[in-house]
């Protein structure tokens, strides 16, 4: 009887031990998971880490070169740290940044770049908003086809697309030939090697960057708000300015930044379509780097441009945080 009574006790103690070990293992995993990033954090953090590394490291290198002096050698700039007689000396040159503020050419170039980028952004908005609105209000099947047409230019090399505009805009190109044949003009329009050609090239190249964020906001808009406005007697223009436009405000800001920021430093379009008097900061940086071999001056121009572009980005970030705070 003692043997039969003691027989069930072994499985019970073994099961209890396994249960205790399982709880302990889950407890250790739960404690460890507190220090590990979640799946969402990893999905968002890895691309940000990638961009930070491949943006921050080159920027730090350019920033370092901007404080050096130009020399004829490889590399064509001096070292910032020198050791003489066991003493470390730092040779930081601020003359390049001072020259940016004193030279009229650089100031005019920055202002011209900002103006051309701003005008191109406004033109992209005026053209892209009706396009995005029409696509968002189309049938789903047609909507997919239209968005595919918007993204279709990205399947072709950017350089080839800009080169194609040379054949369209030059004096004996397709556009002037068509306008003269229709009797609209009698002499060719000077579009190639001019600021007008640069505007056309930038609007064409950056228009999809305006359309896509606008479409993303317009397609999610609640159409019952417009129906309620019409039921209350609002005219279409009033409903658009009071409902549609405010609800698409974030799309306008995002699209404008996606166009404005790369347009400021654009080099290929003004180099191929612009004239000799077309002042863009990208062309100045190229000349300083490769023609003058003045890497410190070119780096200072680059750093100043990046700092200049941080202002609208910081304002946009502040606005987004404020919007989220008001929503809560």
Q: Model-predicted segments: where are they?
A:
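Transmembrane alpha-helices
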Residues: 46-47, 148, 152, 204, ...
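Membrane-interfacial helix termini and adjacent extracytoplasmic/periplasmic loops
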Residues: 29-33, 80, 84-85, 162-203, ...
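Short membrane-interfacial helix/loop motifs at transmembrane-helix boundaries
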Residues: 56-104, 172, 275, 328
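Cytoplasmic-entry segments and transmembrane alpha-helices of multi-pass inner-membrane transporters
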Residues: 43-44, 131-165, 226-227, 240-241, ...
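N-terminal signal-anchor/first transmembrane alpha helix
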Residues: 23-67, 134, 144, 148-150
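C-terminal transmembrane helix and the adjacent membrane-cytosol boundary/short C-terminal tail
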Residues: 5, 15, 23, 27, ...
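Transmembrane-helix boundary motif in ABC transporter permease subunits
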Residues: 27, 31-35, 118-151, 224-226, ...
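Interhelical loop and adjacent transmembrane-helix boundary motif
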Residues: 34-40, 83, 97-100, 104, ...
